[in-house]
């Protein structure tokens, strides 16, 4: 059962939506209002169960209570030359898309899925923006991570498993991929096998691989990109 206070908030949202007063507009950016607190695990679970039924109050609450995630991710892109308020606005579009397309039946947390959508939305904006401006360097240091390593824009964006997998499959078939993998050293091969399940196991996130190997996630991200460049060179030799 929802706690009484949160249940009353939920009912109030339903009333506002029914009256046409509540919309998807976000008033927190640049305003005096504080961001709403994040949902508890129990509250999020209740709202996610209502989402497939088209419950607009649940949808609105899931969006508003995850705005802190948008701000957190947007701040990682502050050194790209885009105004922070614009980044938050763009990231919020990604959050709305995430809530609209989230499938509660899949074994993935909303925060994980939303983070990817928010980052992708900002990345797409950066790419569009680059057509009219000087190119943003994906190897430009943005900050320093917890281990003292430089945090690059490419590290922050992470690596979209689907994009890389489709890119590789579009270039060569699995036979050539496995042949190319044998040109890597043991550590590089292990990282690729863990990340993309190439040895028959499950695909793992960069964080999972970093924890398993005892190194930082940003280092895994950087190393992964170098490995993929090497693989592409091997592909070019074979095709």
Curated annotation (Swiss-Prot):
Keywords carried by this UniProt record: DNA-binding, Sigma factor, Sporulation, Transcription, Transcription regulation
Known DNA-binding region: 206-225
Post-translational modification: Proteolytically cleaved in the N-terminus probably by a SpoIIGA homolog to yield the active peptide.
Motif (Polymerase core binding): 86-99
Pfam families on file: Sigma70_r2, Sigma70_r4
Signal sequence range: none
GO biological process: DNA-templated transcription initiation; sporulation resulting in formation of a cellular spore
GO function terms (MF aspect): DNA binding; sigma factor activity
Propeptide: 1-27
Domain of life: Bacteria
Functional note: Sigma factors are initiation factors that promote the attachment of RNA polymerase to specific initiation sites and are then released. This sigma factor directs the transcription of crystal protein genes, a sporulation-regulated event.
Family per similarity comment: Belongs to the sigma-70 factor family.
Name used for this protein in its record: RNA polymerase sigma-35 factor
Species this protein is from: Bacillus thuringiensis subsp. kurstaki
